[in-house]
Amino acid sequence: MHFRIEHQWNSQPVAHEPVTISLKPGDNGLQMDINAPFFNDPPAPPGPPGQPFPGLWDYEVVEAFFLNSEKEQYLEVEICPHGQHLVLLLSKRRNIWKECLPLSLQVFKTDTKWEGSVLLPWDYFPPSVDQFNAYAIHGSDSKRTYEALYPVPQDALKEGQQPDFHRLEYFRPFSFCTLMGKNWKQPESCLWKI
């Protein structure tokens, strides 16, 4: 399953090669591969590569959200080209109840591109994931750019509106069965027994 982030959050086209996200079955989880332009703006977060970094969304990052739309429970995964990551479990919009979960992450970068590969354990996913969205952020100050796989439609924009990646109403249908087979059942998560 492949996705291309071709628009900014407000439906304007991006001005560079689109970020791509690929999802495929992994060993006891979902393999997520990222291919993106490398802007190196802002500079690397001060945390060590390979470790969780709170507030990673303030840096150059690609994010994927997996949502159970009925209960508004979702997994947010953030990957940085410098090797840091952030995993958030949320119940209701913006309500983080678990964060900084570990990930096994590989990142390769050149002067102009980067690739990330991560295995997302099934335990991290809320039950009955049925919607998805993905985002990319880069740039500093007035050059800060927010991109969305499924952006806010232009006719829904309001004057003065700012980017908000937790607008769950703009997520779109998603099914693991497309990847795993029609009879596949999502493994039960120990973490989501709340």
Swiss-Prot record:
Q: What is the superkingdom listed in this entry's lineage? A: Eukaryota
Q: Can you tell me which family this protein belongs to?
A: Belongs to the UPF0462 family.
Query: What protein am I looking at?
Result: UPF0462 protein C4orf33 homolog
Species for this entry: Xenopus tropicalis (Western clawed frog)
- What is the organism lineage in this UniProt record? Eukaryota, Metazoa, Chordata, Craniata, Vertebrata
